[in-house]
Regions:
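Conserved active-site "lid/cap" helical segment
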Residues: 35-77, 87-100
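Condensing-enzyme catalytic core mediating Claisen C-C bond formation in acyl metabolism
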Residues: 1-56, 60, 140, 152-157
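Short loop/turn motifs at secondary-structure junctions
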Residues: 19, 72-75, 131
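Generic low-polarity alpha-helical segments
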Residues: 9, 71, 79-81
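Claisen-condensing/thiolase-fold acyl-transfer catalytic domains that form or cleave C-C bonds
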Residues: 59, 77-157
Length: 157
């Protein structure tokens, strides 16, 4: 695992043109035995089961988000996933027809930095976002929990 931290600054007085228009979160506790940190031991996971699960859930979440914006220009949609495994991310992007240039990631530079991964990618690209853009975040993480979010960039003012 890499080392990373992220922070969000929120304001009730300064308006923003960037806002989340959709967010869902869920988990699959019945698969508890696939990712385990025993009381007296080390992190252990069933790699094949977890990888397959991550690909399916990331792809499903991404497709769910894209279904919310069917008329959006595909050149204005960007994808960010959990930064644990570049192969998982690339597979999900390909299955959802996201062009490589629209798949943002940094796992190749920093490794798996846990829950700071996706926010750090968003932070790296924040100033590139323009009105009419969308960022689809589909994240699968520890505890076999997943979330999908749609960040919409509206016109200024």
């Amino acid at each position: 695992f890499g080392d990373c931290a992220t922070a969000s600054i929120l304001s009730v007085t300064i308006p923003s043109n960037k806002y989340f228009t959709d967010c869902e979160m869920d988990s699959r506790p019945t698969m508890w035995d696939k990712v385990v940190v025993p009381r007296w031991g080390y992190f252990n996971q069933d790699g094949n089961a977890v990888q397959g699960y991550a690909i399916r859930k990331t792809t499903d979440g991404l497709r769910n988000i894209l279904a919310l914006i069917p008329d959006a220009d595909p050149t204005r949609i960007f994808f960010i996933g959990h930064q644990a495994n570049l192969g998982v991310l690339q597979t999900a992007a390909e299955r959802a027809n996201i062009a490589p240039a629209h798949h943002w990631f940094n796992v190749d530079q920093y490794g798996n930095v846990g829950c700071a991964g996706a926010p750090s990618v968003l932070s790296q690209h924040w100033d590139e976002l323009r009105p009419g853009d969308y960022v689809a975040l589909s994240i699968v993480g520890a505890g076999l929990t997943w979330t999908q979010m749609l960040l919409t960039i509206a016109a200024e003012g």
